C-alpha cells in the first residue's frame, strides 16, 4: 500500500478547527485523508492504543479519558517484550485474509509510535466501572467500533467500512472491560485475549 499526501493546504479546514495552529490543521487533515484512502486498501483506523506482546497486537479502544494509554502502559511494566506501536490511531489492514495492526504518524499528544506491524490478536473496549470483562457478540461490538473509527462521510466509505467490520468481527475476538485502571487489570485482558487466540489456533 502506498498513499501520497500532498500537504499543500488545499484540504485544510480552518473554518472547522479555528483554534488550531496551521501545523495542527495539517496533522488532522492529512490524517483524515489517510484514513479515507486506507478504506480503499482493505484497512481502517481505530481510535485506540496498540501494544504488541508475544508477537500479537492488542488494541484498547474507547472514548477519551477511559484509560487506553494507562492500560497499555501497564502492559509495558508487566511484560518485558511489550511494545506500544501506536498510542492513538493505529491502522488495521486485512492482508491475504489476516488482520494486521500498523503504527502510523497519527499517534496522539505523546507521540508514541513505532513504524512496525503485527498480527491483530484482539480488541478491547474500555469503560469505567467495577471490574468486569466479557466477550462481545458482533452485534454488541459494532456500535462501539462505529463510535471510534472513521468511514461514514460518504455512502462509498460507509459501504467499505461495513464490509471490513463484518470480516473483522467474524475473525477477531472483541471484548469490553469495565475497570478502575489499577495494577493487575492488564493481566485480566491479556489472559482473556491470549486464551481466545489459543482457541482459534487450535481450529486452524
Regions found by a protein language model. Give the residues of each.
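Glycine-rich, often acidic-flanked micro-motifs
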Residues: 49, 53-63, 77-204
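Charged, amphipathic alpha-helical linker segments immediately N-terminal to NTP-binding catalytic cores
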Residues: 1-35, 193-202
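P-loop NTPase catalytic core of nucleic-acid-dependent motor ATPases
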Residues: 18-57, 61
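Conserved lysine of the Walker
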Residues: 68
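Post-Walker A alpha-helix
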Residues: 71-72
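Ordered hydrophobic segments in well-structured contexts
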Residues: 4-6, 45, 174-176
Amino acid at each position: 500500500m502506498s498513499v501520497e499526501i500532498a500537504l499543500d493546504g488545499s484540504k485544510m479546514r480552518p473554518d472547522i478547527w479555528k483554534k488550531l495552529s496551521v501545523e495542527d490543521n495539517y496533522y488532522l487533515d492529512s490524517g483524515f485523508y489517510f484514513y479515507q484512502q486506507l478504506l480503499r486498501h482493505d484497512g481502517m483506523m481505530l481510535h485506540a492504543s496498540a501494544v504488541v506482546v508475544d508477537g500479537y497486537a492488542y488494541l484498547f479502544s474507547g472514548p477519551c479519558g477511559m484509560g487506553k494509554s494507562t492500560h497499555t502502559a501497564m502492559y509495558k511494566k508487566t511484560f518485558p517484550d511489550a511494545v506500544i506501536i501506536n498510542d492513538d490511531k493505529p491502522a488495521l489492514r486485512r492482508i491475504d485474509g489476516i488482520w494486521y495492526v500498523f503504527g502510523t504518524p497519527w499517534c496522539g499528544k505523546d507521540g508514541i509510535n513505532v513504524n512496525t506491524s503485527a498480527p491483530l490478536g484482539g480488541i478491547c473496549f474500555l469503560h469505567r466501572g467495577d471490574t468486569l470483562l466479557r466477550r462481545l457478540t458482533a452485534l454488541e461490538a459494532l456500535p462501539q467500533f462505529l463510535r471510534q473509527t472513521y468511514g461514514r462521510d460518504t455512502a462509498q466509505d460507509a459501504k467499505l467500512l461495513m464490509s471490513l467490520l463484518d470480516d473483522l468481527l467474524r475473525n477477531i475476538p472483541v471484548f469490553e472491560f469495565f475497570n478502575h485502571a489499577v495494577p493487575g487489570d492488564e493481566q485480566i485482558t491479556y489472559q482473556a485475549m491470549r486464551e481466545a487466540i489459543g482457541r482459534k489456533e487450535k481450529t486452524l
